Amino acid sequence: MRHTRRNIFYHELIGLRIKIIEYPDKSLVGLTGLVIDETQKTLLIETNSGRRVRVLKANGVFQFMLPNKEKVIIRGVQILGRPEDRLKNIVR
């Protein structure tokens, strides 16, 4: 199944380009990079300079670039949980 605007909530986010749109720590707003790890509550982002930043999903609004170059803005609370658990929710 391909990443699309409609099903991104049920996909693993590792490997997608990301930009932080809103976050309580204003120094992280505008940060761009690649999602290199995902846990139930956090995303680990590697910036172009190689810096790694772990952010809480629930605290932010993120813009993801899908493989087809489409950009999708998502509130972090919408992607809480592990990818496999998010998938189980849609299957039920």
Curated annotation (Swiss-Prot):
MF (Gene Ontology): ribonuclease P activity; RNA binding
Catalytic function, reaction form: Endonucleolytic cleavage of RNA, removing 5'-extranucleotides from tRNA precursor
Listed Pfam families: RNase_P-MRP_p29
SMART domains: POP4
Cellular-component GO terms for this entry: cytoplasm; ribonuclease P complex
Compartments it resides in: Cytoplasm
Enzyme Commission code: 3.1.26.5
Gene3D superfamilies reported in the protein's UniProt record: Ribonuclease P/MRP, subunit p29 (2.30.30.210)
Family matches, as InterPro entries: RNase_P/MRP_Rpp29_sf, RNP1, Rof/RNase_P-like, Rpp29/RNP1
Gene Ontology biological process terms, A to Z: tRNA 5'-leader removal
Coiled-coil ranges (or none): none
Signal peptide start and end residues: none
Broad class of enzyme this protein falls into: hydrolase
Alphabetical keyword list: Cytoplasm, Endonuclease, Hydrolase, Nuclease, tRNA processing
Function: Part of ribonuclease P, a protein complex that generates mature tRNA molecules by cleaving their 5'-ends.
SUBUNIT field: Consists of a catalytic RNA component and at least 4-5 protein subunits.
Family note: Belongs to the eukaryotic/archaeal RNase P protein component 1 family.
Name this polypeptide is given: Ribonuclease P protein component 1
